[in-house]
Curated annotation (Swiss-Prot):
Pfam families registered for this protein in UniProt: Ribosomal_L19
Function: This protein is located at the 30S-50S ribosomal subunit interface and may play a role in the structure and function of the aminoacyl-tRNA binding site.
NCBIfam families the UniProt entry points to: rplS_bact
Gene behind the chain: rplS
Protein's recorded name: Large ribosomal subunit protein bL19
Lineage per the UniProt record: Bacteria, Pseudomonadati, Chlorobiota, Chlorobiia, Chlorobiales
BP GO terms, sorted: translation
GO cellular component terms, A-Z: cytosolic large ribosomal subunit
Keyword Ribonucleoprotein found: yes
InterPro entries: Ribosomal_bL19, Ribosomal_bL19_CS, Ribosomal_bL19_sf, Translation_prot_SH3-like_sf
Disulfide bonds: none
Membrane-spanning ranges: none
Family per record: Belongs to the bacterial ribosomal protein bL19 family.
Amino acid sequence: MNQLIQLVESSLGANRFEQVRPGDTVKIQLRVIEGEKERLQAFEGVVISDRGEGGSKTITVRKISHGVGVERIIPVNSPNIESVTVLRHGRARRAKLFYLRKRTGKAALKVKERKTQVNA
């Protein structure tokens, strides 16, 4: 059984979410089918958790829309994901940022910025 799981996960290809960590602000373009039309829907928010490994890995992204918190659990290997853009690298001291759920307004999205090193 373990060999079967490895075979399926190896066929999934490269992971587009390797650089995404909790605390990062990301913009994800998702393919949405409405009736016979297909369009792209952007979801921009803070990654508050990642879960699982390999083919079953998911991330939870949270944003505030019109004063209401909206969370979306996104499977990393979903074929409906068009692109992933990291807008800001956040510095989180926890693996799960569920404490952001209790915050409102600007404080709900406030995560310190992570310093990135430039290799010369």
